[in-house]
Amino acid sequence: MSRGNSLLRVAGMATMPSRATTAPRAIESILPQVSRLWLFLDRFDAVPEYAEHERIEVLRSQDHGDLRANGKFLSLALDVGPCTFFGVDDDVLYPADYCRTLESHLGRWSGATAVGVHGGLLRAPVTSYARDLKVLHRRAPRQHPTEVDLLGSDSVAFRTSTLRFDVRDWPDVNMVDLSFALSARRRSVPLVTVPRKAYWLSALDENQSDSIWAGVLRDDSRQTALAQELVALPRPPLPRRRSRWPRLFVRAP
């Protein structure tokens, strides 16, 4: 949670009934680190027991529409005040120093970037999103910060004073990483992956048949169009760094 005069930490997650095994563990790992978790329940008949907590604010698709995974960011358009916002997923286990570490990196960029763990670089010209995306996977180690075209919304942080948007204006659902990247680039906000050890974040489950990436592999035509739109926009310059990187990481020469 927040300390002293620092910004509140707020997280957003979207989940669906098929994640009933992993979502409670993901929530358990992130909840102690934030003041509030906005939890978007996609097509639930009832609020599950694991969502009943004083620091969890439930948003239901029956009340807010068919936003699917986009719902993790819905609170930005509601009553979230100034904060550091963390996008998290229902199938990722977050380490105890997760929020503190990402906040530290935001501070080193003066809060003018969005930072994250899972990222991607697009090779231009983009002819296929699935083929032309180089993934910097969250489980892989990185020795130095890297500016990227996309950040995975499962492991992203930013200050609401720098970036705020309304997912209800996004034309697509379940294309969160690309839609987030476009929102950031249109506002000239750079995206940066942070240094970390291997498996600093760990997956609670992978390769689910109903995952967003599985859908991309079946048909990436719409994602390709969005990726082409993204690379056509100039990548914003990185701001000047304020201080050295945390001792936990070794920066590459």
Model-inferred region functions:
Residues 1-8, 12, 169-253:
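C-terminal catalytic/acceptor-binding lobe
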Residues 8, 35-36, 84, 190:
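Residues at the starts of beta-strands that form the adenosine-phosphate
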Residues 13-33, 38-41:
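Short, well-formed alpha-helical segments that are part of the catalytic scaffolds
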Residues 19-22, 44-50, 124-125:
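Short, charged/polar "capping" segments at the starts of alpha-helices
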Residues 42-83:
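Active-site-proximal specificity loops/subdomain of glycosyltransferases
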Residues 82-93:
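Short beta-strand-to-loop acidic/aromatic patch adjacent to the donor-nucleotide binding site
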Residues 83, 149, 156-174, 183-189:
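Aromatic-glycine-rich donor-binding/catalytic loop that engages nucleotide-sugar donors
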Residues 93-167:
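Conserved catalytic core of nucleotide-sugar-dependent glycosyltransferases
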